[in-house]
């Protein structure tokens, strides 16, 4: 395994700690990417897919109220994301 794509930044930080416990170096031996853009990720140099969790939560609450009141709701919502490259990922090794 050369990379981990975690469902959250917290899980990604756990993967980094587990890799270190196993003697694996991040990013030399294992690249790690999280999702959220959590502030703690900046402290540990975590590459992340940043998203606006506050806006998503706000919109979810409004949608729930609309559903309770019988109002029509969209089938899906799409939010912008941004790849924030930090020190937990490395380029693909030649020949890999």
List the predicted regions and their residue ranges.
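Flexible loop/turn connectors
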Residues: 1-95
